[in-house]
Amino acid sequence: MNTTSNETLTTVTQQSFIIHPNKILLMILYRYGLGFVFLIGFSGNFASLVTFMSPILRVMSTGCLFFMLAMADIFYLMISIFEFVEVGIVQEGIFLSVYDSICRFRWFMKGFIRFCSAWILAFIAIDRWLRTRFPYKTNQWCTRRNAFIAVSIAAVFAILLHSHMLSSQLFGGLFPGTPSIACGPIDTRSPYVFFFFVQWQIIQ
C-alpha cells in the first residue's frame, strides 16, 4: 500500500506541474481572474441578500432557499481570498506556522459549502416543481420550516462526508503555495493518499 501511495502522490505532483507550467501566467490568472470573480460575486450575492430579505420574499420557502444559497456563495468567496493572496499576490505559502490548521479549515469548509450549495439548488428546483404540480399543497409542503429542515439534513451529511479533512492525523499542508496540491494527506505513505487523490475525487 505504501508503494501505491507513493506512486499516487508522484503522479499527482507531476500532473500539477504539467497543469501549472507557467508561474507568471498562473499568478495573473489568480490575481486578476479571482479579483474579477470577487467583484462580481460579492456584489451579486449581496444584492441577492438584500432582495430576499424583503418582507414578501423571506416568508416564502423559495426566498429562504435563495437567501441561504447567497450566504453560502459569500462564505465560499471569503474562503477563496486565501488562495487569491497566496497564489496571486504573495506567490508562496503564507502563515506556514499554522498552515496545517488553515488547510483543514479551508478544505473542509469549501467541500461543505459546495455540497450544501448543490443541494440547495436541488431543493429550489423541487420547491418550484411542487408549487407548480401541487398548488393546493403549497402552504403545507413549501414552508420555511421544511426548507430549513431540508438544508439542515444536507448540512449534517456534508459534515459527515467531509469530516476526514478535520483530522490532524490525516490532513494538512502538502505543498504550500501550489494550487490544487497545497493541502493534502500529511503522511505520504499512508493509504489515505490513495483515498484522497483517487477515491475521494469520485465520491465528491
Predicted feature descriptions by range:
Residues 33-46, 50, 68-71, 75-78, ...:
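Lipid-exposed faces of alpha-helical membrane segments in multi-pass integral membrane proteins
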Residues 9-20, 89-112, 139-140, 160-204:
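Loop architecture of class A 7-transmembrane GPCRs
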Residues 23-35, 62-123, 131-134, 138-139:
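Extracellular TM2-ECL1-early TM3 structural module of rhodopsin-like
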Residues 1-43:
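Extracellular N-terminal segment of 7TM GPCRs
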Residues 30-37, 64, 106, 145-151, ...:
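Transmembrane alpha-helices of multi-pass eukaryotic membrane proteins
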Residues 75-76, 86-89, 113-123, 130, ...:
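Fourth transmembrane helix
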